[in-house]
Amino acid sequence: MSVKEGAQRKWAALKEKLGPQDSDPTEANLESADPELCIRLLQMPSVVNYSGLRKRLEGSDGGWMVQFLEQSGLDLLLEALARLSGRGVARISDALLQLTCVSCVRAVMNSRQGIEYILSNQGYVRQLSQALDTSNVMVKKQVFELLAALCIYSPEGHVLTLDALDHYKTVCSQQYRFSIVMNELSGSDNVPYVVTLLSVINAVILGPEDLRARTQLRNEFIGLQLLDVLARLRDLEDADLLIQLEAFEEAKAEDEEELLRVSGGVDMSSHQEVFASLFHKVSCSPVSAQLLSVLQGLLHLEPTLRSSQLLWEALESLVNRAVLLASDAQECTLEEVVERLLSVKGRPRPSPLVKAHKSVQANLDQSQRGSSPQNTTTPKPSVEGQQPAAAAACEPVDHAQSESILKVSQPRALEQQASTPPPPPPPPLLPGSSAEPPPPPPPPPLPSVGAKALPTAPPPPPLPGLGAMAPPAPPLPPPLPGSCEFLPPPPPPLPGLGCPPPPPPLLPGMGWGPPPPPPPLLPCTCSPPVAGGMEEVIVAQVDHGLGSAWVPSHRRVNPPTLRMKKLNWQKLPSNVAREHNSMWASLSSPDAEAVEPDFSSIERLFSFPAAKPKEPTMVAPRARKEPKEITFLDAKKSLNLNIFLKQFKCSNEEVAAMIRAGDTTKFDVEVLKQLLKLLPEKHEIENLRAFTEERAKLASADHFYLLLLAIPCYQLRIECMLLCEGAAAVLDMVRPKAQLVLAACESLLTSRQLPIFCQLILRIGNFLNYGSHTGDADGFKISTLLKLTETKSQQNRVTLLHHVLEEAEKSHPDLLQLPRDLEQPSQAAGINLEIIRSEASSNLKKLLETERKVSASVAEVQEQYTERLQASISAFRALDELFEAIEQKQRELADYLCEDAQQLSLEDTFSTMKAFRDLFLRALKENKDRKEQAAKAERRKQQLAEEEARRPRGEDGKPVRKGPGKQEEVCVIDALLADIRKGFQLRKTARGRGDTDGGSKAASMDPPRATEPVATSNPAGDPVGSTRCPASEPGLDATTASESRGWDLVDAVTPGPQPTLEQLEEGGPRPLERRSSWYVDASDVLTTEDPQCPQPLEGAWPVTLGDAQALKPLKFSSNQPPAAGSSRQDAKDPTSLLGVLQAEADSTSEGLEDAVHSRGARPPAAGPGGDEDEDEEDTAPESALDTSLDKSFSEDAVTDSSGSGTLPRARGRASKGTGKRRKKRPSRSQEEVPPDSDDNKTKKLCVIQ
């Protein structure tokens, strides 16, 4: 079997194993498909369909892309991406499907029409962000790249990206909008993915032009522990990661420097410095009290709660508004200032009448929630409709006064009614009327407690229910509780309005309709009328809030005389049962039929039976059992003693023998302390000694006590055992600490490197402080060593200590051994000398006292413990001498360091030395790391310089860009990401140059030369081109920029200055407005002219790349570009232009990485012997700027357009010896010719390096 037949069999077996896949005949030719067909295929998601669509999107022109977008192609892609992200990636096919889907979205955004269409709709970016809710790291990497590109594309893109992150936070229930970024950054070890996340952070921070906005965004990330994560990432060895880290640090340093200059020397990134500056400003003014109150209030906000986060954001917004209002010089009251702070833009300010109405309504709503539901308020529209009539009928009342009366009237009424007996009640009031309480003194007019009638009465008399004053009615007897049920039934009232005027008079409290039972009428203090007649509602609430003893008839029952069994029911809430439409509310009406149950039978049947008294019975007394054990101890103590004895696992006699012999092998300090607590008390001793029966009857604990009492001086023996054991433990703990403190003092006094280092710091400090009151110093306090890191240099992450160590490494290498001299003081840090000395002194006193007791005890005890006590006393006296030596060294150290001997704390001194030693070692490590990073950056810079040197150059010495000649549009996303991977170099160039430099460069631009028109469209009028190598559109027909401000896709598509007046007069389109700092020229890496065609064409417009700067077209010596005739045949064949590059773009296992790599490799030159040149150029290394999509995939997967399967393939290309006919591709210097009228589907490539 030949090798070829074996390969064919393997191929067939693999296809059979993979199984049949859904394929469509049109998928193989999607390059010529119209948008409608592509959208139809989108409804059948598959890797083959998405791959074919991606190639079609990359090769489409502007018109085709617009049709695709207008037919909701992007909507289908985003919906499919969200659906695929939601169902997980259980299989590799799901992951590939997600990856190819997001690559289609990227292909859409690569075109100017696509990205502008996305930015025109907020929902698209939100949908894109929802694709982050997946476990597929490659998909998340692609989405994050798209969001980063949107951030730097335009201010609108930056705003929409932040909005999308806010939306994702809400949808996924996260606490902060940047939590998704920081969580992925903290939990990922995939270096390319980490680089992408850092690029997102940089793009978000560097997006806004406003310094304060950038600082705020950066502080949000820092608040999520970004600096700690960056410190960990610096240890990773990756060049692309280093670029992003440097971009973050450099931008942070620049912003801090600018902020320091703007804020007058205050470090606005330091909470302490900002607060110190604020406190210094207000400390001598009455405003300090308000500042203290604000701080006290903020102290109660817990930052971990989600509601607190919203409150902090609201407070920040209020402070920003307060800063804006502070510049307003107009004088206004406190209420007006608060109103202006809380006012919403675009909402008209309410008039005083409306504010009064709203305040009443707010109080009403609050009182309703806290009171009984009997009070049914009038609907808001009715109240608002009655305002004009109320204003005409009522006397004007001051708004502020009415509000204050409203706030205090109800509590005051309750207090008065609760504390004083009720006076004679007023007469019953007619609906809508009002009366005055009986004098003296005359209070404000009492509004009606009845219902408000509809405003249908004739205009002359005051309308009922509107608070009009009525003459007092003749007095009537007070109503009795429950008398309302004998009234004739009124007609059904309107909801919440009570009865209209025609019904008969109602007693007070009945105006709200039949359901609520009326309370007894008691006088109350009421407020004067308020706008809208709402005071009636408030008065009714006050009356009702007093409660009522009246009970409806259907609820009245007689109390039972016996204890009844309970009915297990579920009570309805009162506010539900008393609704006027409910069945229970209808039972309270006077005309309801009363049903009286037979309570006597119920009481007889459902009461608990009476307990019968127990009859005394003669029970024979039980014979008293003799107790098995006799104990004189209480149960708790006996239990504790038994537990204590069981731990020895021996008999009581053995335990007593060990105590008698002073054996401490089984007695440690804690056991002896517990035994002392369990010793028998005086009464227990007397009882045990009086016991004369058999000891076998005693309990175990009592038996142990008898054995213990038989030992002479048993308590003193136990105390001696405890003291000897405790003294040994104290010596083992205290003596090493005291010796270490003494050695640390000696180490500081004898260190050779410390004085030399301090001398170096002294000279540097005098140089820095020269001419100030802190200059010309003879020395400094030792705590100054900790402040060396507070003096920061202009270089990023370099402090004075870093610089001193760099100088010491060069000139005084011995000083780097200083941490060795400070090792013992660092170890002694944290030892409190006072505590250990007091503990040693107390033990010595106990030993001396115990020795005195032993000397007066029996001879056996003296023989056992005198020698042991003497040894412990000698050891503690030696320890006391050690403390005396430490005191002497402390005085010497105080003199050595020029400190006060009485105030010098050895603990603080050693802690200072430990902190300084840690700073010293950390600075050494950071200096070493910075040197290594600088060396890596230098090697990378040399690599880029070598790559730049290998690029061909034109007559003016500038690099010449090779590739398809008609570069009418650029791949926006790829170009932006190329600049991001370079560390935002173009943005740095713009900021470093400034507006003045930019203006001078713009003024020095060469004037546009005479140009010739170039055919850019087919006869049918359809634009031809591609989004990867886009077709011509109005205003997009040129390929190069001016000589001084040229652009190259290596750097990015970037906006530049506005076109000159001459360019505008020639009819070129005006670029869109965009921030001046984004994407301006990088002329050192940009090609501007074709060396063979130094003159531009006639009549061509300058190119506007999105909102980029105007570019000049190439000039050809004839109407056709060079070598156009030789390449026309190749241009007609799309495959001849794609070649191996198109095959690489089809890879799906690494997603878009291959596409980026294929765009990064330029087409080789075709000519005589072109095969050798082609191989030589194809084997060139890939650009170091490209990051892989996912390095966990070791092989690429190729999916052909016919759906035959997904196969692994190697990266290498077929060698020349395979016999395959290699397709000829145009050289990079060749320019493509406009295709014939019958072929407008020509594939073009957008070459991105």
Curated annotation (Swiss-Prot):
Compositionally biased tracts (Acidic residues): 1170-1180
Biased amino acid composition, Basic residues: 1210-1227
Tissue note: Widely expressed. In the kidney, expression is apparent in podocytes and some tubule cells.
Summary of the function given for this chain in its UniProt record: Severs actin filaments and accelerates their polymerization and depolymerization.
PROSITE patterns recorded: FH2, GBD_FH3, WH2
Subcellular compartments: Cytoplasm, Perinuclear region
Domain GBD/FH3 residue range list: 2-330
Region (Disordered): 1-29, 347-489, 928-966, 988-1076, 1112-1249
Swiss-Prot/TrEMBL domain comment: The WH2 domain acts as the DAD (diaphanous autoregulatory) domain and binds to actin monomers.
Pfam family, one: Drf_FH3
Record-given protein name: Inverted formin-2
An annotated GO cellular component: actin filament
Natural source organism: Homo sapiens
